[in-house]
Amino acid sequence: MDGDIRKNSLDDGSMDALTGEQSIRNFNINFGPQHPAAHGLLRMVLELDGEIVERADPHIGLLHRGTEKLMESRTYLQNLPYLDRLDYVAPMNQEHAWCLAIERLTGTVIPRRASLIRVLYSEIGRILNHLMGVTTGAMDVGALTPPLWGFEAREELMIFYERACGARLHAAYFRPGGVHQDLPPDLLDDIEEWCERFPKLVDDLDTLLTENRIFKQRLVDIGIVTEADALDWGYTGVMVRGSGLAWDLRRSQPYECYDEFDFQIPVGRNGDCYDRYLCRMAEMRESCKIMQQAVQKLRAEPAGDVLARGKLTPPRRAEMKRDMESLIHHFKLYTEGFKVPAGEVYAAVEGPKGEFGVYLVADGTNKPWRAKLRAPGFAHLQSIDWMSRGHMLADVPAIIATLDIVFGEVDR
């Protein structure tokens, strides 16, 4: 009929009015939270132009438990297990920062033996983390053998955790004033024997991955971060060292007795995913050397207390059985908790993923007034849009893997 305005039934609003052709639009997809390469509860809305990433919008908070608020209503000692549940891949490294913050506010000096045990188990945590990061990252780009090898070594390290404190994962082993208990007699021998075998595993992973043509094609020149960019985004750990900046708190701001240990700081040149992979491989070798040195120093150290006895720590069991004052102190410590002098402090450790810090504000009571947790993964994840823009969709899992994020600490 004359005058009819005939509409194309297939037109969904994307038809060009002048030419009648279908205009090409970007489309959005959801990456995660149920995705094997998301490394936790990561949901990203990806805007794609074909297979090119135009925008990556990370949605966080799916694992938010309100940790910082919960810490304000519990005693300092009751708060310690919360730290294990942040970066649950290497739990003791987070406990370390919490204990350092309390010790600095109270002016506590811990026994040397406890300090050496802390260094030993912090490096075990670093290897636990890097084995997980490197091998699952390799799996994300198609190499299925490394996780099978890496998790075998991780299992042995988790048994060392269990033999020291009774727990494989949520240890609560580091305590304000030292560590909960001394190591069993044969444990140092077994750790030393493991350290002699471990470089062979790293060599095998090296042979399998480092010069593998497909592996290099997936990582080289992907997710490049310059030194200036790393500083602008607030990167720490491997993310900043992979870009050429030799910043490591164990060397630049030594804590515990790290200044007594001989180790190198692996540094990359190109700031891409491949350099970050190489840094983690080299760091595992250096951590193994630190563990061997710690074992030798612990052997040379006379057997003694691993807790600085005082207001922060319980009395010895033998004293409690014969002294009423000690028994009362023990009861008060585990019911009311110890008081921390009013003040504020920032204590940071070089965690496996970067600088993990605790900003603690004390008001003189037995509970913190405020505890701010500085999670390295949070700073790294904020740049995922900037890092992945212009890359292929298949490059996104490789970038996420070398960011090394875990959602226990990102969401807190």
From Swiss-Prot:
Gene3D superfamilies: Cytochrome-c3 Hydrogenase, chain B
GO cellular component, one term: plasma membrane
Keywords (A to Z) from UniProt: Cell inner membrane, Cell membrane, Membrane, NAD, Quinone, Translocase, Transport, Ubiquinone
GO molecular function: NAD binding; NADH:ubiquinone reductase (non-electrogenic) activity; quinone binding
PROSITE patterns the UniProt entry points to: COMPLEX1_49K
Family per similarity comment: Belongs to the complex I 49 kDa subunit family.
Protein name: NADH-quinone oxidoreductase subunit 4
